[in-house]
């Protein structure tokens, strides 16, 4: 039996514990207020209005929404310290707008709120999963679209943090290499790479058909069809051998039906000196790691992943997968955002 260290968190008096739990309850409503503000463009319209803000009726008109519920949203957003209200006009703080709306920044959290709220729409089946241990299997198309919004932050992390940790990879991408993105979703990482490194040759593999359709449409709209090819398929042993210089999993390895098979198949695709890179958010190694905001978020995501048959892992558990697939021990690179890069490279 594996024993985990306990951090023995400080006991709270009853009144403090009550306040702590009430804060969790209000956090549920705050998440919904944020998601609605993002989806309906309320934060975007307030940001466009600048420091002067908008009247509540003006906000409803600008967002093409109904006045009474938008006014109620303003009350909830003000109560949650998301907007300011001087009695006549509502405005949004620039930093709040940046965090919730700017998708190309590592601080972007709008996708996290979209994912969390959207995932919770399936939780009418969560109690049954806990009783039986039988995952629900496939999630809805809306869930996969929310995952794409969630991973917008991952793309920013890759460009700002991962590439900074691997300057030799930047040089290779500039010169032009063959790259494959495994479980590419809607293809946003591929498009970002294509724009930044126009000599790179890119392939995206994705089994979920709704995501394949969105990725294909996005590539066509962006005029990147000569640089990016999307394939509707799973990651398996039938993938081309010795055809790529970089194989990339972005928040995706844990979703594979058999991660060991996926890693082995991916390794076979690489040419000499080729890299296999996994970017993800790993579970803490012990209980101490859960006593933080990051630990709380990862623990919640881990439960959601188990719900449909996926599994987040610690860095050590990832290393076990690599060994089981016959790969060398990956180098684990912790990033400032708390994400982790796992990197393995073929010999020359």
Where are these regions (language model features)?
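A short SAM/SAH-binding and catalytic strip from SAM-dependent methyltransferases
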Residues: 245-259
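C-terminal alpha-helical "lid/dimerization" subdomain adjacent to the S-adenosyl-L-methionine
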Residues: 279-325, 330-332
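Core SAM-dependent methyltransferase catalytic element
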Residues: 325-348
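Class I SAM-dependent methyltransferase SAM/SAH-binding core
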Residues: 180, 190-235
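A short acidic, Gly/Pro-enriched loop at the edge of an enzyme's catalytic core
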Residues: 236-247
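Helix-to-beta-strand junctions that scaffold the AdoMet/dcAdoMet cofactor pocket
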Residues: 224, 256-257, 270-271
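Conserved Class I S-adenosyl-L-methionine-dependent methyltransferase catalytic core
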Residues: 24-28, 36, 76-177
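A short glycine-rich, Lys/Arg-flanked "PGG" loop and its adjoining helix->strand segment in the class I
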Residues: 260-272
